[in-house]
Structures are given as C-alpha cells and as structure tokens.
Amino acid sequence: MRIRLFLFFMLCADISWSQTFKVDVRMIEVYATVSDSRGRAMTNLHSDDFHVLEDNRLQQIRVFEPQSSAMTIALLVDTTGSMAADLPRVKNAVARLLDAVKPEDNVGLFTFANGLNRLSNFSTDRNTTLKAIFKARAAGQTALFDSVAQLSRQISKDGGKKAILLFTDGDDNSSVLSLEASVKSVQRTGVPIYTVLYGSALKDQRLSQRLEKISVLTGGIPFKVKDAGGVASAFARVGEDMQNMYLLGYQSDSDNQDDWRSIKVTLPNHPKL
C-alpha cells in the first residue's frame, strides 16, 4: 500500500519517516491519494479508515471529502512571448483536459505574462472556459514565481479540494519573488501545483529542475512532454490524479506556538494492503 499526502509533502505507508511543514491556522487540511501494491487507486474509503497523527498524537478528522467530491481546478497558462509558437497546441490540449474533468468540478482559467490575469471565473460551464482559452494571446515578459504564489493565495480562501495546473516553459524574468520564496508562499496555502514543461525548455536542465521543484514541494506532479499528444496525455493523468484525492481536515490540539508540525496518515483498518 502506498499513501501520497500533500500540503507540501509526501509520505509512504511502508516507510517510517515523516516531514514537517509550516501552517498558519489551527484547522489543517491534508490531501491524500492512496494506491495498492500494484499502483491502483483505492476507492470507496471512508473517514474512519484514516488515522491522522500530528507529532505522534491522534487527531479527530472533522472534514472529509471522498474521491467523488467536486474539485476546484485552476488552469494557469503561460502566455508570454516565449510561448508564442507553442500556445496553439496548448489551447487544444486544454480543450481535451476539459473533457476529462468531472462535470461537477469547478474550473477557472488564468494566464500570466508580466502578471496574473483571470480569463474565466470558476464554473462548471466548460463552454465559457473554452471560449476564454482560445482568446489568449502570447506577449510580454514572464512573472512565473509571482503568479503561482498569487493564484494559490486566491484559491486557498475557499474550502474543499483544489489544485493548480501550470503550463509553462519554466522561464522567469520579471518576478519580485525568488523561486524559494514563491514555493514557501504556495506551501503555506496547501494548494498542490502540477507542472507541464513543454517545447524548447525540455533541453534546459535548469528550467526542468525548477518546475520539478515547484511540483514536488507543493504536492503535485511534474510532467515533461515533447508534443501535443504528450500534452494531452499529461493533462489526462493530472485529471485522474486529482479525481483520486481524499481531503482530510482536522483541528489541531497542539498548544505549541511553534507553527512547525509533523503529520502522518495511516490506514489501520487495512493492515494487509
């Protein structure tokens, strides 16, 4: 059995270590995906199947959203000048992704160049999002780090399962925040970021490592794709991964004023998995 957890960390059920992370509120949300030894997603789990431990103390789960619950998905598309040649294929891939998400999922479309722009509000109306993406134009410099930090803060204000899907060539030439500061800002919100690296940036190890760091440290998955077909496949994999999320929320019982906690999630009712 394997459990993948994220606010901005990953834990496996078959190893004994855990990572610490920083929180600013007493109600803490933990996202988890659970798979068996063959890598298949475990479905139909309930809140009493999970145990959440903070600093080795069992916590009461107060919020539970199963795999079937709706998600808030923010599509963040790089529309800077460097993406001009690839943007038409990105638009087509986004259209295919919209076919893969569940009808009840709320999807919003954002772009960034010199700053963050909202092209469509969160909605279950896919036609609105489709019309918005095909109006996007490539121009301007790249404020990648600022944009992901700003968007994660915006969508973290609402409850429920949420994620950012970032499509970019990985460059940044106009952000105020550094990569490290941006990642820390996103970590505080608990929003996972899935990154898709495409085009000429695949040949740049520095850009590849940058996007991998953004994804892994926020609980998402990094993807590298070589063509439009690969883009669509990556988007489909992201949609599947997000649909397999469980959301666990608990009220911390700690009186410790230190914001750093160690969290572990187990499935005691399934010892043979």
PLM regions: where:
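Scaffold/interface architecture of coatomer-like assemblies
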Residues: 17-273
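Sec-dependent signal peptide recognition
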Residues: 2-8
